[in-house]
């Protein structure tokens, strides 16, 4: 239980830092996600090549690539929530992933629902509902944040099975590659709908 709480606090801290940088970067949420996953893909693949000399990918790794797609869309909605609202709203909505995980994990893993976890995580839902009703300017950001937390709950639940293989670096690298390809395929259509969209980061964006 203590380890779970430590992991939760660490995840919230990382989400806060990521949210702050995402808010400071002038790029669109889709581009932020694309560049982030591309950079992570290159670094992790290089690490694997240096360590093992080669990377073996077979048909059994396809589901790992699809998990990367799921993670990519989670980040797009997370950064979208921050852009449309603010960092605080984005992070609070991210905390809602605990509520969704308490529902999704028993369903996927065929286990009993932990009513204690569900009750504790529902407190976040109560806080979000207060913000939603009292500040209409944040509603789009809250909706995007809720979708983001739902996607992350699915990702976290499915990723538990994948990480049991023990090849964490390879798994993460393949997920980053899958997410990068997904954003790459989406970007041409997205760019057409937003012709004024800047594709290249500024020097200030590179700092963050």
Task: Identify what each model region corresponds to.
Residues 44, 48, 96, 103, ...:
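Hydrophobic transmembrane alpha-helices of multi-pass small-molecule transport proteins
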Residues 1-34, 69, 73, 77, ...:
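Glycine-/small-residue-enriched transmembrane alpha-helix faces in small-molecule transporters
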Residues 79-85, 131-141, 193, 197-198:
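Membrane-interface helix caps and helix-loop-helix hairpins in membrane proteins
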Residues 51-89, 94, 130:
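Specific transmembrane alpha-helical segments of multi-pass solute transporters/efflux pumps
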Residues 8, 32-33, 64, 87-91, ...:
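Alpha-helical transmembrane segments and their helix-entry boundary regions
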Residues 26, 84, 110-112, 165:
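Helix-loop interface residues and adjacent transmembrane-helix termini in multi-pass membrane transporters
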Residues 3-7, 31-46, 117-123, 163-208:
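Hydrophobic alpha-helical transmembrane segments of multi-pass integral membrane proteins
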């Amino acid at each position: 239980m203590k380890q779970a709480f430590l992991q939760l606090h660490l995840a919230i801290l990382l989400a806060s830092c990521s949210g702050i940088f995402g808010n400071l970067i002038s790029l669109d949420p889709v581009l932020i996600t694309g560049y982030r996953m591309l950079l992570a893909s290159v670094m992790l693949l290089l690490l694997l090549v240096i360590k093992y000399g080669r990377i073996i990918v077979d048909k059994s790794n396809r589901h790992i690539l699809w998990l990367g797609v799921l993670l990519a869309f989670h980040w797009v909605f997370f950064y979208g929530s921050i852009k449309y609202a603010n960092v605080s709203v984005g992070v609070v909505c991210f905390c809602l992933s605990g509520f969704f995980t308490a529902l999704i994990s028993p369903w996927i893993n065929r286990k009993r629902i932990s009513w204690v976890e569900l009750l504790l995580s529902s407190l976040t839902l109560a806080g979000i509902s207060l913000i939603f009703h009292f500040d209409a300017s944040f509603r789009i950001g809250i909706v995007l944040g809720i979708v983001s937390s739902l996607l992350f709950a699915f990702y976290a639940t499915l990723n538990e099975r994948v990480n049991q293989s023990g090849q964490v670096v390879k798994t993460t690298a393949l997920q980053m590659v899958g997410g990068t390809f997904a954003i790459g395929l989406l970007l041409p259509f997205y760019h057409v709908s937003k012709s004024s969209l800047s594709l290249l980061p500024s020097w200030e964006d590179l700092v963050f």
